[in-house]
Swiss-Prot record:
It comes from Chlamydomonas reinhardtii (Chlamydomonas smithii). Coiled coil: none annotated. It is found in: Cytoplasm. Residues 403-487 are annotated as: Disordered. The gene is DAB1. The keyword Cytoplasm applies. The keyword rRNA-binding does not apply. Pfam families: DUF4470, DUF4471. Residues 417-438, 478-487 have a biased composition (Low complexity). Belongs to the DNAAF3 family. Required for the assembly of axonemal inner and outer dynein arms. Involved in preassembly of dyneins into complexes before their transport into cilia. This is Dynein axonemal assembly factor 3 homolog. Disruption phenotype: Nonmotile flagella, with paralyzed half-length flagella and disrupted outer dynein arms assembly.
Amino acid sequence: MDEHNVHHFWGISPAVDLGTLLPTGDGAADLPVDQPVRFLQVAPYDARHTLTTLSRACRHPALMRQLPPGQPACRLYVWEDSPEGLARHVLLAAVLLDGGVPAAQRGQLLLELHGNAVLRRRAAEYLDEKARQLESLFVGLAAGQPPPAGPEAEARGLAALAALLDLSLLKFQEKDLIVEALQRWRLPNPTSSTSTSAASASAAAAPYDMVAAWDGRCRKVYGERYDFRRNMVDWDYHMRLQPAGTPGCDPASGSIIHFHHFRHWRLHGVAHELRDSAYNSANRCRGEGGVGEFKDRTGRDVGRSVSAWGFWADVLNSPYHAFGTACEQPEFYRITNKQFVRTAVDVAEHNIAALLHELRTGRRLELGEGQEAHRAQAARGPTTLEDLTAAAEEAAAAASGAGAEAGAGAGPGGEAAAGASSSSGKEEAAAAAAAGKEQGQGEGQGEDWTAGSGSGAPGAGTGQAVAEGREGPGGPQDSDPAAAASTAAPAAAAAAASSSSTSVPTYSSGGRAQVAKAMAAAAAAAGAGAGAGAEASSSGAASAASAAPTAGASSGAADGKAAEAAAAPLDEAAREQMAAEEAAVRAAEAALDAAARQRAGRFRLVLVTGDLAKTLTGRAKYAGAFSGLSLGHRHTHMLEPQYKLAAAAAPGARLVAENARHVLQLSQEQAALFAAKMDELAAAGGWRPLPAAQRPPGITEAAAVYVRAA
């Protein structure tokens, strides 16, 4: 195991709905009647259990009970070994509740902040803005100030987050360390800072080269085999990850984590490349301080080193296990040609969208009859044979179409022009695709939200860039240039037509399907009316010009003004209709976000760090208080009796402990020994394995389930 892997940013098991750990049937009578249900997460490494439990609370009546005013229905206690881990936990919960960002972009931001080492510029600006908001929130809560109020704080979820957080078990020093971690997440030169105080505070933020930090970690891990790291990635995937299989599927089918995605993350730290954008800004919430402890030759503690801020995390085990391997929809596990049709990136994006949908509506997100499983907007290279075939067909069609258009426009010399075009079609298509990609880099297409007030930020930052050469044959590739050119040509023609016709309304809908359809219909109607008026104007002008040129010119001008006057009411009506529909959509979205914040108000998130036994589990107040517990794989030693997890668990409480099934540093035999040692520690700590028939739903083979011994 890597001794420098001192910080953990994600777990290696799927997210667990802690509500499934509650007893059902006759056992439900053992739950506290007038007290909230309590869950304890020991080193979850991220907020996946919290987000899943919040979103799926409607499935469990015990979490939806009406208790006295001011009393939550559920308390989630989260212990992390570092204050930075708690700060990241709160950050992901804040993104989920942020109603100022559309739901689709919110899910993408959450995945990027969770698993990417480098971000889009806009995502980095959002992190900067959210860090400032959380810093102000923590300072206010620590000082006993009233929570944020006002429409802006309500819409951005700050008021709901203030009601959700409980800092009563944190020491003053630990609160200060959380605030210090949030301050480090600021951008060195943010474009969204408008006030002098914010600019001066951000000036103290140190630059952070995540690309160099990632490369340094890889050099430390691989050592003298650094130059052959691609071979090591190939070995880890095919000899360790693939045999472990996919939850709920035959292990012979391999892993749903695609090799292209896994290799790209191992080499560059980008797990979710969801937009055709430039990922060139450091994910500053992945930087933490490393403190070395020193002992003399007798084993006596002789002090600690000064904390050094850097990247000290895992670069071997990918973050796809958290949200990308387990799914409630069986359509994502369809296999064709002995491989999964969907990948972990598709599953992760669907799972986050499903969590948001269920939190906002109280209903599960189900695929309709005949509806295709979700596919991410930009996959990393062709992931199926169907993708390869479609890309080849599109490239051939684009090349032949380019040659035909050039031949038709050449006139008498069309044959020679067609020959030249057919030979150089791919080069022209590549140039067009490159130009289009330069225009679309950085910001992503169709976004209507801004981070803070910096809406005019440049698309591509001047900081780091993922130092990636093009992958070799069979590796991750960008979309085919010819196919990109074939799709870019109609878009360019439509843009030219819309710019030349003043009667067609232009409107940014942010990608919402309803408003997009209404906009297209209104534009078509306005274009038809303008075309009819222009045709009548041209015919009248031509007939008049044959008799009297001067009169014909004046008649054509009059007809043109009449056509514009006739189209003006239609144009204004279309704009008003689209504005009304957009307002209705925004009102509906705001209502859904308000409902999500109301459901989250039934919970309290209690943050804990430091000595767990002294702060929480060893206190008489919490004896037998927790109905369910979870434990991370790097902290299985806390099953020992001295940490008193069994003493804090209620009778019959269940513990979900992450095992080493997906730890790539261990072979299958070593992972089996790890599981056997876990069982030994659990038995000594007062836990016994839960029979397989009683295993709660949604918990995969990546975790062991124990029940408190009587």
